[in-house]
Amino acid sequence: IERAIVEHNVTLFLLCNPHNPVGRVWTEDELKCLGDICIKHNVIIVSDEIHADFVWDGHTHTVFANLGESYAEHCIVCTAPSKTFNIAGLQVSNVFIPNETLRKRFVKEIDKAGYSQLNTMGLVGCQGAYEVGGPWLDELKVYIQGNIQFTLDYFKQYLPKLRMYRPEGTYLMWFDCSQLPLTADEREQWLLYDAKLWLDSGSMFGKDGETFERINVACPRATLVEGL
């Protein structure tokens, strides 16, 4: 990472934690290592933590700004209630910028772009979701973990040629189709027109993802069973 930052004169690093699509939850040590590199080269880290509420047993989410003052001064943390509470339609998100100078620059730019005003419904919905949505979220997480385990068991029993990875976080599951005798395009055509499934092709995440597919298991179990 450091070599790439230097060679390409990087000034801003986009971090996804928990990671979409592979489901990694970066450890505190990993985040500090990245932070030290970025601080050394004066790189701002934009930490996309939109799936932070979906971190599974044995793993802990660390807010990048909470690593320490020096890390906080070099970061922008982005969250939203849309994934957690399924309210993307309210079009509201949260941007935390501890560095006052950087925050003023950000506010100036969104004012220029015409995005300085939140819609009232979005603001009320966001506040209400975080204030009273905890019990609902607790139940949801149990349900989604059940879907994750069901999917892992199903792939192991019925789809042994497809390697399914257990996510450390998010409700998105990532599986490898490299043992299938199909190109990425052939696989997409088969899934869409024969299986009648519209998954997310790994190709959209770059060349290294061409043999992969992503599936969203945050749905009713009956829907998941039908799709599988």
Could you tell me what each predicted segment is?
Residues 104-111, 129-152, 183-184:
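Structural signature of PLP-dependent enzymes
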Residues 6, 71, 181, 190-199, ...:
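PLP-dependent enzyme catalytic core of the Aspartate aminotransferase-like
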Residues 67-105:
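Active-site PLP attachment segment
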Residues 1-60:
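Active-site phosphate-binding strand-loop segment of PLP-dependent enzymes
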Residues 5, 38, 68, 155, ...:
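A generic structural signal for well-ordered alpha-helical segments
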Residues 152, 161-164, 198-203:
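A short linear hydrophobic-aromatic micro-motif
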Residues 120-123, 127, 142-152, 164-177, ...:
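Conserved glycine-rich beta-strand-loop-beta hairpin in the small C-terminal domain of fold type I
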